[in-house]
Each structure stands twice: as C-alpha cells, then as structure tokens.
Amino acid sequence: VQTCALPICQEIMSLLAEEAKLMEIVKLIGSDVLPEDQKLVIEICKVIRVGYLQQNAFHKDDTYVPLQKQMKMMDVILYLYKKCKDLVAQGKPMSQVVASGIFDKVTKMKYDVPNDHIELLDDYFRQIDAAVSQVA
C-alpha cells in the first residue's frame, strides 16, 4: 500500500476512510439519521471520488492531468470541506449547503478548467466563499 507523505493527501485519505465507515451505517439505517458533520463527510467524499479520483480517459483534459492541477484541485476540495465544516458547526443543515450547487460546481472543475489554464481554479475559492456566505 502506497502512502502519501503530503498532509493534503493524508487528509483526503482520512476523509475517505471515515466515509467508508459511515457508509456501513448508511446501508443499515439510511443517511437521514446521521449528524450534519457526518453528512458533510459523505458529501465531500462524493466530490473527491467523482470530481477528483474518477478519470475519464476519453476527455481531453482528464486523460492526463498535470500535478499542479491535481494539487490545486485538492486544495479547492479541502477548502470547501473546511468552509462547510464551519457552517455545520454554526448549526446550518447540509441540505442548504448542497442546495447552493457548490458541490456540483467543484465536482465538475476538472472538466471546466483546461489543463493549460490552472489559474482558473483560483476562482473556485471565491465561488465557495460566495456560496457559503449565502447559506450563512
């Protein structure tokens, strides 16, 4: 088993491991009974799996993704997680955050940002801030 020494990779792997445990509970009793912070883990892991880990070999920008873009995408995903974690700590329901559409936008970023314009990923931080401020 290969492990990543980078803290950002470790945080993502930790979230995915936590999601695996939570999915056992979800299979038995459903996700409605989970506390909001655990619902957040499940939602952010969907973004990680679909928007980051899953690869489309037939898409021109997803066939090969430069390391800089991969790292920036991880930054964006973890920024979304931290901002949403703050909202949940304030008592905001995950349903409001998901309804804002920001999870879908972040999931699609690998297709929306060309590999030769990685700087466009910086705009996702602003979009996350805007979505969070609307929910807050």
What are these regions (language model features)?
Residues 1-136:
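Conserved catalytic/coupling modules of large nucleotide/cofactor-utilizing molecular machines
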